[in-house]
């Protein structure tokens, strides 16, 4: 699952491609038919998206599926490796001694080359083929392994949901815990809370907790990292909280050294557990900050501070390639939704996708921990 896409490619296996093509071009929302062949068709959907449909016999479906789910770079490297084994590989299958061997199961594409099956998220030519040949691919994190959301905004700040509603929804998701993480006072535009308001919020959390004993409600803030690297709430208040996330919300365009030092100062704060949406990018709107990432990763590893993977679709931050790099330093991660509305809690799957593309497993993600392990980690 990539952050953004261009055209949409759909593949299918059928013994009657003509019937499928007819149904495809008549699908509700198709505003223009670009091409319509016997086994291929291209349409414009809803006057915006181009959708291509290609239909092959069932015995070629596996190789075609691999072709469309691998990036171009991955496929080039895979085909180059096949050539070293005197094989020619295409979306139709393998040519062996001039004869075509068709593949109807995608996993058999990799098995035929005597390598482990490579999950689609890893097919970016970042060393996955070498790892598959050595049987050293990581076991990737699954959505079902998430025990709770560590970054949810309530209507105490700029969220549009009550703490009770957050807790009920989290119970339905099967979570063991949920973290109420409102903005702090320095972010006035988001109705950030001061110390007095945070103590009032805690009373509501305690009341809701009594009504929901099966899930643990943890108290948190998303504290603002000021331009100086200082935090905008008193240390004594931070020490009362279960988890603290620190994020940059202002002064986005500092130079690389200044921004790096600013973030590292927050990482080193003894009460900060997580750095929220670390790069600051908003897809299609704002580029990432200028940051020396190796320095940030080293600081996180030294201070045992986690980096957030924001599952919010316009953020998806930290980006997958940086997750992969950070993992090599021993950095831990928290996959969070940054939910402000109830349906945002369902966005977790997008953060999981980023983590998987970043080669992350369950052991790399702190909100796969049990409640007791998470609390122990936060006390590190």
Task: Label every model-predicted segment.
Residues 220-223, 350:
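Active-site catalytic microenvironments in core metabolic enzymes, especially phosphate/sugar-handling
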Residues 3-154, 160-174, 185-215, 227-380:
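Charged catalytic cores and adjacent phosphate/nucleic-acid-binding surfaces used
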């Amino acid at each position: 699952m990539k952050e953004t896409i261009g055209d949409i490619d759909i593949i299918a296996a059928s013994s009657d491609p003509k019937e499928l093509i007819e149904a495809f071009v008549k699908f509700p929302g198709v505003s223009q038919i670009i091409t319509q062949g016997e086994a291929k068709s291209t349409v414009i959907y809803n006057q915006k998206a181009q959708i291509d449909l290609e239909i092959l016999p069932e015995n070629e479906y596996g190789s075609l599926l691999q072709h469309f789910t691998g990036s171009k770079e991955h496929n080039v490297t895979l085909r180059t490796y096949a050539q070293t084994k005197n094989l020619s590989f295409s979306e139709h299958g393998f040519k062996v001694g001039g004869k075509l061997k068709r593949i109807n199961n995608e996993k058999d594409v990799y098995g035929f080359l005597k390598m482990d099956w490579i999950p689609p998220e890893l097919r970016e030519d970042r060393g996955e083929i070498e790892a598959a040949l050595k049987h050293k691919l990581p076991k990737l994190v699954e959505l079902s392994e998430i025990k709770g959301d560590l970054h949810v905004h309530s209507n105490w700040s700029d969220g549009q949901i009550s703490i009770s509603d957050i807790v009920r929804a989290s119970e339905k998701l099967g979570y063991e815990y949920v973290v109420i993480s409102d903005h702090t006072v320095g972010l006035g535009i988001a109705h950030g809370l001061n110390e007095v308001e945070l103590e009032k919020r805690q009373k509501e959390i305690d009341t809701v907790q009594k009504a929901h004993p099966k899930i643990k409600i943890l108290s948190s803030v998303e504290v603002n990292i000021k331009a100086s690297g200082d935090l905008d709430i008193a240390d004594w208040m931070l020490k009362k909280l279960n988890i603290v996330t620190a994020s940059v919300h202002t002064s986005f365009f500092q130079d690389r050294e200044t921004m790096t030092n600013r973030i590292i100062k927050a990482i080193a704060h003894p009460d900060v557990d997580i750095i929220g949406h670390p790069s600051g990018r908003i897809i299609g709107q704002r580029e990432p900050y200028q940051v020396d990432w190796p320095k940030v990763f080293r600081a996180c590893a030294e201070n045992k501070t986690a980096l957030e993977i924001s599952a919010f679709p316009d953020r998806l931050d930290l980006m997958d390639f940086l997750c992969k790099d950070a993992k090599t330093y021993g950095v831990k991660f928290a996959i969070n939704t940054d939910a402000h509305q109830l349906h945002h809690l369902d966005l977790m799957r997008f953060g999981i996708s980023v983590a998987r593309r970043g080669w992350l497993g369950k052991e790399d993600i702190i909100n796969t921990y049990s409640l007791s392990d998470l609390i122990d980690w936060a006390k590190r």
